[in-house]
Amino acid sequence: MTKVGLRIDVDTLRGTREGVPRLLATLHRHGVQASFFFSVGPDNMGRHLWRLIRPRFLWKMLRSNAASLYGWDILLAGTAWPGKNIGNANAGIIRETATYHETGLHAWDHHAWQTHSGHWSIRQLEEDIARGITALEAIIGKPVTCSAAAGWRADGRVVRAKEPFNLRYNSDCRGTTLFRPLLMPGQTGTPQIPVTLPTWDEVIGPAVQAQSFNTWIISRMLQDKGTPVYTIHAEVEGIVHQPLFEDLLVRARDAGITFCPLGELLPASPESLPLGQIVRGHIPGREGWLGCQQAASAS
């Protein structure tokens, strides 16, 4: 049996309102639990449109047929009008999710984090994280114990900025296996659970066709030599590609794969995890930098 952590990112108002309820129903039908990470502040995702001037981002949008994949309400959110507050508008849905699934913070403002966190000070990072955690805790009525950086925009500064919040784990980077981030010699931070597998929008196109994606990603899960962690998005697998995701759950079960919340991947003694660090890097299919796992020594 292969155990795969299932992470569900919720970036937008529509993803929360439409995608999450469908995913909750789908997961319930198949007896699967996952980790949901919510954006809870303003939905300004449409402001990413200016990135179309960048060739790699434009190619990604064309390759994934973004207009039909996400819908124009997502692609234009927060452009000609102020972005609506996601958490306030969907508190009931988020609360229901937290009743049945592990629930953590993705971002206060997904667009702002993805665009500006790379040059924010530690204080600015801490204030933004605190704002998101406070809002999410007010909605779900219990402490937030985990987080996942929006767009995997994380480095050593982000690791340090999250330390005051006493989280059980963070999932801020791409990598191969769980690790303890090294803050300084002799001091480690909150365990990291990296995403190890590509997302739909990173690979779909000339290399992998939509109709063969599930077969392809299942083979990657079975071949994963580390701790497999897979990310889906409420805006994609919860809306237009919900049937594809349901088919994935069936095929994965038949292949001996069991999905679980990320928190279930943590060992009883996190001190046994190897040391590592998060550095800025790039991966195929994703525009811009993102946090990547790198080995580190204790000295």
UniProtKB/Swiss-Prot annotation:
Protein family membership: Belongs to the polysaccharide deacetylase family. ArnD deformylase subfamily.
Keywords: Antibiotic resistance, Hydrolase, Lipid A biosynthesis, Lipid biosynthesis, Lipid metabolism, Lipopolysaccharide biosynthesis
Keyword ATP-binding: no
Catalytic class of the enzyme: hydrolase
Naturally occurring in which organism (per UniProt): Salmonella newport (strain SL254)
Molecular function (Gene Ontology), one example: hydrolase activity, acting on carbon-nitrogen (but not peptide) bonds, in linear amides
Full protein name: Probable 4-deoxy-4-formamido-L-arabinose-phosphoundecaprenol deformylase ArnD
Domain NodB homology: start-end pairs: 2-260
Keyword Transmembrane annotated: no
Designated gene of the protein: arnD
Catalytic activity field: 4-deoxy-4-formamido-alpha-L-arabinopyranosyl di-trans,octa-cis-undecaprenyl phosphate + H2O = 4-amino-4-deoxy-alpha-L-arabinopyranosyl di-trans,octa-cis-undecaprenyl phosphate + formate
UniProt pathway: Glycolipid biosynthesis; 4-amino-4-deoxy-alpha-L-arabinose undecaprenyl phosphate biosynthesis; 4-amino-4-deoxy-alpha-L-arabinose undecaprenyl phosphate from UDP-4-deoxy-4-formamido-beta-L-arabinose and undecaprenyl phosphate: step 2/2; Bacterial outer membrane biogenesis; lipopolysaccharide biosynthesis
SUPFAM superfamilies (UniProt xref): Glycoside hydrolase/deacetylase
Gene Ontology BP terms: 4-amino-4-deoxy-alpha-L-arabinopyranosyl undecaprenyl phosphate biosynthetic process; lipid A biosynthetic process; lipopolysaccharide biosynthetic process; response to antibiotic
Enzyme Commission number(s) of this protein: 3.5.1.n3
NCBIfam families: PRK15394.1
A Pfam family reported for this protein in Swiss-Prot or TrEMBL: Polysacc_deac_1
InterPro entries noted in UniProt: ArnD (IPR023557), Glyco_hydro/deAcase_b/a-brl (IPR011330), NODB_dom (IPR002509), Polysacc_deacetylase_ArnD (IPR050248)
Gene Ontology CC terms, in alphabetical order: membrane
Function: Catalyzes the deformylation of 4-deoxy-4-formamido-L-arabinose-phosphoundecaprenol to 4-amino-4-deoxy-L-arabinose-phosphoundecaprenol. The modified arabinose is attached to lipid A and is required for resistance to polymyxin and cationic antimicrobial peptides.
